[in-house]
Amino acid sequence: MATHGQTCARPMCIPPSYADLGKAARDIFNKGFGFGLVKLDVKTKSCSGVEFSTSGSSNTDTGKVTGTLETKYKWCEYGLTFTEKWNTDNTLGTEIAIEDQICQGLKLTFDTTFSPNTGKKSGKIKSSYKRECINLGCDVDFDFAGPAIHGSAVFGYEGWLAGYQMTFDSAKSKLTRNNFAVGYRTGDFQLHTNVNDGTEFGGSIYQKVCEDLDTSVNLAWTSGTNCTRFGIAAKYQLDPTASISAKVNNSSLIGVGYTQTLRPGVKLTLSALVDGKSINAGGHKVGLALELEA
């Protein structure tokens, strides 16, 4: 029993990747909203284990329609995942990932894209390593001018988190991104602060007030300007099948969203964005999204 307990406890000690720092707060602001879009997402899985994901959306302002198709197959015995992607810009993508095979906690991904219309090609090698108290990442983005190297590291100890993210452009021989982050998280509370390139400062707080209510606060400021961005968001679970979300920022933009699970595998989301400074002037946005999963 002791061994089983250690195995279950280990994942709780692994810090998130740098990109996922503050994710809980961002999700309250982003999920459950889809202003200005009519969107359809469909996910299915074949008997052979191949996963199909299709997504289509129409912009209500421009009328532009975009879509994506993705197929994924997992070869669990060897820790391999094969992914094929296509979008309406006629860009083809292939991704091969191998995880926990070379060593425990290491994931390698080979990602390529090709556009037949323009002949443009791109390639990227991604790597991540996560163990107790540490999460490392290193990506190499290949380009004809010279590869760009993206690196990140997050360290965690007793709820405290510290992270660093950088990008080195070999063509320019200089750092093009230099970010720092510090945070703290417990089961129902998360605090995140970050500094991007020494000019952008941000912070967020996530609080699970009770079992049905999640709240979030976001603050951002850019040096050299008098512009401070501030927002508050909340999500309330009405019942096991329905939830309502709301958010407002210092620009008086008010967003509301309602999500209803119509039946298992069928989810409907309605959302609206209202400009509080010009309620009678129009320009407000609505959105509709339908998710199907089988």
Curated annotation (Swiss-Prot):
Catalytic activity: chloride(in) = chloride(out); K(+)(in) = K(+)(out); a 1,2-diacyl-sn-glycero-3-phospho-L-serine(in) = a 1,2-diacyl-sn-glycero-3-phospho-L-serine(out); a 1,2-diacyl-sn-glycero-3-phosphocholine(in) = a 1,2-diacyl-sn-glycero-3-phosphocholine(out)
One GO BP: mitochondrial transmembrane transport
Cited CDD domains: Porin3_VDAC
Subcellular location field: Mitochondrion outer membrane; Membrane
GO molecular function: ATP binding; ceramide binding; cholesterol binding; oxysterol binding; phosphatidylcholine binding; phospholipid scramblase activity; porin activity; voltage-gated monoatomic anion channel activity
PANTHER family, alphabetized: VOLTAGE-DEPENDENT ANION-SELECTIVE CHANNEL (PTHR11743), VOLTAGE-DEPENDENT ANION-SELECTIVE CHANNEL PROTEIN 2 (PTHR11743:SF12)
Purpose of the protein: Non-selective voltage-gated ion channel that mediates the transport of anions and cations through the mitochondrion outer membrane and plasma membrane. The channel adopts an open conformation at zero mV and a closed conformation at both positive and negative potentials. There are two populations of channels; the main that functions in a lower open-state conductance with lower ion selectivity, that switch, in a voltage-dependent manner, from the open to a low-conducting 'closed' state and the other that has a normal ion selectivity in the typical high conductance, 'open' state. Catalyzes the scrambling of phospholipids across the outer mitochondrial membrane; the mechanism is unrelated to channel activity and is capable of translocating both anionic and zwitterionic phospholipids.
Domain comment, as recorded: Consists mainly of a membrane-spanning beta-barrel formed by 19 beta-strands.
Protein name as catalogued: Non-selective voltage-gated ion channel VDAC2
Native organism: Homo sapiens (Human)
Gene responsible for this protein: VDAC2
